[in-house]
Amino acid sequence: MAFNLRNRNFLKLLDFTPKEIAHLLELSAELKKAKYSGYEQPRLTGKNIALIFEKSSTRTRCAFEVAAFDQGAKVTYLGPSGSQIGHKESMKDTARVLGRMYDGIEYRGFGQTIVEELGQYAGVPVWNGLTDEFHPTQILADFLTMQEYANGKQLSQITFAYLGDARNNMGNSLMVGAAKMGMEIRLVAPKQFWPEEELVTQCQEIALQTGAKIVLTEEVTEGVKGCDFLYTDVWVSMGEAPEAWDERVALMTPYQINMDVIKATENPNVKFMHCLPAFHNDETTLGKEIAEKYGMNGLEVTEDVFESEYSIVFDEAENRMHTIKAVMVATLGS
């Protein structure tokens, strides 16, 4: 079934129906196959795209740029120091200026209200590259990756667990995505790190319509048993104070994904996922500081899991580009 998403914003998965999300995933798979097969047809030729990054990025920026280039579009990158947004010019005014010059706008930054305002006033499609509350393009990549590794299961037949800080944009977005697609998600975290009650209630209401199951638990063994996928993210998110580390590490250490947790799934085919970057060894400046301060070689995931046959994080990272391409083509393409 064809769907017309032209001129739609892509700000959060709550705005989309399960069938629309499934359409974007199907289009992602088609575009990925076309790129690999060498017969990709540009559908964004002549389009100009603005990429607003108020937070730094590797995967999201590269994914948007390569996806745009593949499809014939040109991009302008506006980094944290490259615009007047919020300093000398309001987002409302910026939206109306950029909307006159560009055919589509990506935003990666802080509050969800900011990207919502951009979407309200730009007059062209606006895509959320990450906010404090939601990370919808990451979820499309995650679900495409799950489909590729699910051994024939539909999304609605998949059970997965998210361990760690479940109140951040990834916990929120995975819960919304699972609710929309009829999946079973288990948020395994200290209670104070569960998503906001209002969002949980909203997702539970969606789950009643889709057959999804949302479980919140503090028990790791209970949470991971029988899972098809285990997912985690960093324990301290972008923008949080360094002083938060001590308390956070103490609270989160029981939720580290290590080989014992892998075994606790009782599923030899379980796969490990992470939106990246990950603290899994001491080969980075921050990783080395963590190892020295806490005596841990890896935080949210251990090196042996990250580099194991269970890990599909780099397929997941690649799929950022294919799914972002699908969003741009669906909302802007000819």
UniProtKB/Swiss-Prot annotation:
Function in brief: Reversibly catalyzes the transfer of the carbamoyl group from carbamoyl phosphate (CP) to the N(epsilon) atom of ornithine (ORN) to produce L-citrulline.
Pathway(s): Amino-acid biosynthesis; L-arginine biosynthesis; L-arginine from L-ornithine and carbamoyl phosphate: step 1/3
Protein name (record): Ornithine carbamoyltransferase
Molecular function terms, GO-annotated: amino acid binding; ornithine carbamoyltransferase activity
Residues where carbamoyl phosphate binds: S57, T58, R59, T60, Q84, R108, H135, P136, T137, Q138, C275, L276, R320
EC number: 2.1.3.3
Main subcellular localisation: cytoplasm
Taxonomy of the source species: Bacteria, Pseudomonadati, Pseudomonadota, Gammaproteobacteria, Vibrionales
